[in-house]
Amino acid sequence: MRRLWLGGAALSATLGLLSPGPAEAWDRGDVHNFATIPTFAPSGPGAACPNEAKSCTSDVEGVTVAPDGTVYSASYGYNRDGALGGYGELFVFAPNGQLLTHFPVVGSSPHLIGLEYQQSSKSVLIADLGKGVVWKVDPKAQTTSMFMQAPTIIAGKSPGLNALTFDKSGNVYVSDSFQGVIWRTGPSGGTPTAWYAPTNPGQNDLLLPDPNKGEILSPPFGANGIEFNNGATALFALNTAYNSIVKIPVKTDGSAGTGVTFTTGLNGPDGLAVDANDNLWVAANQGDEIVVVDPNGRVVAKRAISTALPVTARSRACCFRRALSSARTRAGSTSPISRFICPLPACRRSRSIPAGPSRSSTTSP
């Protein structure tokens, strides 16, 4: 995401594999609840709440913010009691956290994940994990159209669209967690091209979630949060299953070079944002925290999820415009979005990230 945000309920990213250290070693800053996802009655084909309830709440996976400060988040289709059916739901909040409205994303699956506000169209682009589609939603008219649909290019796999970002020309990039691909399309959408893929010549499989022999990887998501550095010379992509950040060089013609592992040891990195100093803010869903990694791959700060939330809360998405974050709690009945107070705090120490599970990558000839 281009703006500074930290968000998502039912989110997945953590640093549980970091070497242990005393909790007081980090200034974790202030965290306040920003908003709470409301209960709603699902609509559309197969609409249902767990336990046959008439209405329910949902975890949320992503969060984005418009230039006027309006905050958007979409339902992920699960809560502590199970899965929801029907269309996904888009929630709209005022800059002060007040719920303005919510409505169904007609045509979608229940499982909406990453989303970005597209200023050129004044629309919200939403990745649909269940259908391999990016939806374009007009939040004023509450209408939905298909922006792009990803094809299957890896045998035995289906598209699993997850996170989105833009380049400086307005092109849209979408991570595919199941096929290990970064898709690209123009500002108006349409048929995407595989900007980065295991099948592209000179590229590799560092974004796939496939385990090495004898390994069990969980959660089984490959390419996840994606973001360019400020100079647009590299795109960083998180591999949740491998606890890693992959750095993909951007060539002068805008094409992708060969990705390399930038750092590893993050326990389920999920959401990603890049600040003005090229620090990477990673939502860590197994450690219930936001971890800040500097341009050299060192952890320089941590932001904790609100202590008011149970330890089962999960942090998934990141977005930097307002220093907000969202978190899901499986132990409770609500899905809060939390506000993280910036600027980046000074830390008592920094440390390198130890290695996590390694991948023997294969580069396409």
Which sequence ranges carry the predicted segments?
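Beta-propeller fold detector
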Residues: 30-39, 100-105, 145-151, 192-206, ...
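Bacterial N-terminal signal peptides
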Residues: 8-18
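Blade-level signature of beta-propeller repeat domains, shared across WD40, Kelch, NHL, RCC1
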Residues: 325-365
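Short glycine/acidic-enriched loop and turn motifs that connect beta-strands
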Residues: 77-82, 131-133, 179-181, 242-244, ...
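Short loop/turn segments that connect beta-strands within beta-propeller blades
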Residues: 93-98, 138-142, 186-190, 249-254, ...
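Beta-rich, blade/repeat-based domains predominating
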Residues: 43-47, 52-68, 85-87, 106-124, ...
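Sec/Tat signal peptide C-region and signal peptidase I cleavage site
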Residues: 20-25
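Residue position within the beta-strands of beta-propeller blades
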Residues: 71-74, 126-127, 174, 237, ...
